[in-house]
From Swiss-Prot:
Lineage: Archaea, Methanobacteriati, Methanobacteriota, Thermococci, Thermococcales
Alphabetical list of Gene3D superfamilies matching this protein: 3.40.50.10210
SUPFAM superfamilies found in the cross-reference section: Nicotinate mononucleotide:5,6-dimethylbenzimidazole phosphoribosyltransferase (CobT)
Any GO molecular function: nicotinate-nucleotide-dimethylbenzimidazole phosphoribosyltransferase activity
The species this protein was found in: Pyrococcus horikoshii (strain ATCC 700860 / DSM 12428 / JCM 9974 / NBRC 100139 / OT-3)
Name of the molecule in the record: UPF0284 protein PH0034
Amino acid sequence: MKKVKSLFLLVLGNTEISTIPGISVAGATPELTKITPVADAEYLFYEKPLTIDTIPVTPEGHPTPAIITKAARELSNFPILVVRGGTYLAPLIPHVHISNVVGRDFRREPALPEVEVIIERAKLLGKELEKIANEIVIGESTPGGTTTAQAILWALGYEAKTSSASPENPQELKEKVIKEGFKRVGIEKGGLKDKPLEALKEFGDPMIATVLGLSLGFGGDVVLAGGTQMLAVSALLKSLGEDLSRFMIATTRWVVEDPSATFIETAREIGIISYVAELDFSKSKFKGLRDYERGYVKEGVGAGGATWLAVKAGYSPEDVSKKVEELYERLMGLR
């Protein structure tokens, strides 16, 4: 059987952490962050989401990075498989169900007691996908996920600062929340450095557990399409003894250039290579897109990895940026 070269997976996740006021702008309000993952997934296949009538936006109205993934796919037509890692709602499109578990608020209780079951199921899926694809590119949509990622990285002993979908990265709030979680568990930074699954169980989210399982089950090349959240996955893989030479992170330059985060340093410390999508929205006629250049949104829904697939298919980052402009114009016309 002939395998497909690359299969794009979009893993959806929710965590109660996203409802802490001020921590996530991956939704117009903290409550709406619960719907963001399913809306992102639906928008990849339809003119607009089905669960909610508009695409996810930040409180200031900046469009979801799903628009980049959709643009790249419209150009290069790669196959997409949506995976429900653990969300409040099921997306109204065909998808693989791993769990309906939502990550708990780790200040109060362990975030993911179901970690083993989720990893096991995702591993099984990864093994099956190996029969049909040479490579998988895994993106994610998980509001609040940069906080869970930073908590895991800290628990494993990395001095990491993760990015945010806002130019005002709520780093102080993130650190306060993480420290409260560490206090509950009774650890300092690095306190779980030899216990990766414990770190994931205490502070993680279902997306990270699902991506970890997929990565362990699939024996071919894996592109982790995301910013600082995929650094947490990489750190867990390394800690579990995986050889990172078959892995690569694909992200956008907005994550790499984020002065409030440590993407390059942390990737180097973990020892994983990265591809950076050189997208540029500075000449867009829409403020919602131009503001990506001011540090809004940055990455998500596998935007960097989807751009990488389009580039591999012979398109340029400029082509992707142009297509994004077109899609945004179409959206504006639908209102």
